[in-house]
């Protein structure tokens, strides 16, 4: 058995547990919906903390042909696996604080306490791998196998590979000084732009909405990328769905008084996303030329992107997105989404759905081009709320005894995709994948494993493998439901081609079978 893999999943008790179970390598039965949540009541679920990893013990995959040009460093054939350190002063990766006094940039949580390392595979009795599989070539991709359901892991005393994962998380910790400096620079530019936008009648009510990985406390690697959303409350609007997409809409005003400053952006009855974004971009471009104490330039517009991207001091990238704020009821397409009833409770779900929703000027795909007048639903503020209050217990992660590994798993998943994108950046195979795909899959895994004990920090290796297994399943089945809009498939063929999904599947499978050598690159 590969040292990174967990043991085979245990079957649920006969007390009525209905969570689907299958091997990631050899699923039996009909394909499962990758985002289907267990339908059993809480009493019928497996006991808290009973997990089951993705594959059967000792399962192997067919070797792929080596590609010497793309080969990452792996252990030499016949080399013995190194023992994991017996004990070390491991510290939980923390989110660094922001610049003092920055109103718009909230300081992340303080550093978390140390975690104990898992023992070596020799101590656990696991069989260590001695022969790494050769890395797959750029287009050496398999045919998709049978899909598997999201596994429920079986807890073990020592998670395989946990020591390496904690070392990776340690590497991903952000420097307090670096994050404070970067956050301070971003805040200065953002404040300057907000003041200027408020002087324009169309954007007079604009405000800052703190969203993105910095505010979710899951930022990794370096504080060189920030997402900023400028929200603008709009009067009563009417949404007209575009081409049964469930996520893209035309925006109309129910009433349009003559004094409405947004009337200048109307195309007939429709609020033109392209016109409004063009004016937004023009104001920002003019204003950054007046910022004297900081070097700021605007990057070229990306096709279909709703963001205005700025580069500060040649090293900090800031995506600024305009968002319309609506305090109306959420659209009907979201009715079956946000399935957190068994995780965070039905009460929390009801409270979250009472919050506003947002619309960003994201162009819908239309053939080989884009429909430039559409707006896309956005719930990034709800995502932040969930990640910052992620425990079934309200005290989860508030003290040393109740720490979970949810955010650590998300950071590792984001880093895995980030590293693979860096490795293949010249080949463009992975350009259409983003951290949002990883975060969406992670939310679905949280839904299917709602108990805090199912994310025990001692089971980091198993929990991470669970997330990897689910993401692979979504790639194979070409189905990843938007967490808020179930009928909107983020992995549909018109958004991401099949070949790219097969390529990413092959790369992730190789990484998992060889203890993730990509974590040691770059």
From Swiss-Prot:
Residues 1-160, 173-215, 384-407 are annotated as: DNA-binding. Changing residue 59 to D: In 20DE phospho-mimetic mutant; causes inactivation of nucleotidyltransferase activity. Residues 88-97 have a biased composition (Polar residues). Residues 64-75 are annotated as: Required for association with the cell membrane. Changing residue 353 to E: Abolishes stimulation of interferon production. Changing residue 407 to A: Abolishes enzyme activity. Abolishes stimulation of interferon production. Abolishes DNA-binding but does not affect translocation to the nucleus following treatment with etoposide. Changing residue 95 to A: No effect on type I IFN and RSAD2 induction. No effect on cleavage by CASP1. Highly decreases cleavage by CASP1 and enhances RSAD2 induction upon DNA virus infection. Changing residue 13 to D: In 20DE phospho-mimetic mutant; causes inactivation of nucleotidyltransferase activity. It holds the Pfam family Mab-21. Belongs to the mab-21 family. This is Cyclic GMP-AMP synthase. It comes from Homo sapiens (Human).
